[in-house]
């Protein structure tokens, strides 16, 4: 039986998790570039018989400093932790990123947090890792402090995708442009949203296609349109195929962006249930129709395309 990762919300970790390998970063989406980092860390774990830990921040610093940056995340914290557990890390530190923490000087971060509290043997970071007040700290500074605090910095070469660095920023860009397949290739899986089903206006039900309205919270917003999806309920491993509309429902003049999911061969109450919606394929852009009958005809065409999607 595989032991589940220990989750910490501060730097007061148990002694068994000190002198470990620590990977530091946001790890939003945990894409192929991140996975390359974890694969290398596992080689070090095997070679030196060490545990692997992850230090990540919540909310992501970029979202903390820009409170207008509402739709940014590729994955929720829950999804991130679940994926880290699947990578079989030994522990995860989800440090709350707040005003006090943002003001910590870079040298204090190295001395007090890394040097005294975590005491890692190896620190894995990307080349552009910044830390400390006003992002004053960088990887060069970490390396200069190696001897003083007994750790070694590992900075792997980034993974390239079509001659560009495989990054969370690149994935967001692909999603926003409607290039779902490229985003999924860097993620090495289908991009997904995990959210709670909310009670809506039941417009889908009135026109013959009942939908579950998902709260998208602060997820990055992909290109508005219709998508082939598959859906999983919390705690279940089986998926249901479906179709989703992400957008403003221009036929009904909606002001708030919505994620509406219609499941094939399903009947039941999903209100207040948590669903994971995987985006498989982009079908078409959102469009305003002259009347409900035109919309209904188009939905039938969309359904056929979604059902054929593997």
Predicted regions: what is each one?
Residues 199-310:
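Phosphate/ribose-recognition catalytic cores of enzymes acting on nucleotide-derived substrates
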Residues 51-117:
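Active-site-proximal cofactor/substrate-binding loop regions of enzyme domains
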């Amino acid at each position: 039986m595989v032991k589940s990762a220990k989750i910490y919300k501060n730097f007061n970790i148990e002694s068994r998790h000190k002198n470990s390998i620590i990977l530091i970063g946001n790890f939003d989406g945990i894409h192929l570039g991140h996975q390359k980092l974890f694969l290398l860390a596992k080689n070090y774990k095997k070679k030196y018989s060490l545990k692997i830990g992850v230090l990540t921040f919540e909310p992501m610093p970029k979202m903390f400093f820009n409170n207008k940056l509402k739709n940014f995340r590729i994955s929720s914290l829950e999804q991130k932790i679940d994926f880290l557990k699947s990578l079989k890390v030994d522990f995860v530190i989800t440090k709350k990123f707040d005003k006090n923490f943002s003001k910590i000087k870079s040298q204090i971060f190295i001395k007090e947090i890394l040097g005294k509290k975590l005491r890692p043997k190896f620190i894995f970071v990307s080349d552009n890792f910044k830390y400390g007040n006003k992002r004053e700290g960088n990887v060069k500074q970490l390396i200069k402090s190696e001897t003083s605090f007994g750790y070694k910095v590992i900075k792997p070469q980034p993974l390239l995708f079509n001659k560009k660095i495989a990054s969370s920023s690149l994935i967001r860009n692909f999603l926003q442009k409607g290039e779902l397949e490229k985003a999924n290739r860097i993620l090495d899986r289908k991009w997904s949203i995990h959210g709670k089903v909310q009670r809506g206006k039941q417009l889908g039900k009135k026109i013959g296609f009942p939908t579950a309205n998902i709260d998208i919270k602060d997820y990055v917003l992909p290109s508005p349109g219709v998508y082939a999806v598959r859906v999983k309920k919390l705690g279940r491993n089986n998926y249901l195929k479906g179709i989703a509309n992400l957008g403003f429902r221009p036929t009904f003049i909606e002001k708030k962006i919505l994620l509406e999911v219609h499941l094939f061969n399903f009947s039941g109450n999903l209100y207040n249930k948590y669903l994971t919606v995987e985006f498989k394929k982009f079908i078409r852009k959102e469009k305003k129709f002259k009347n409900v009958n035109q919309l209904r005809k188009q939905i039938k065409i969309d359904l056929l395309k979604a059902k054929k999607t593997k």
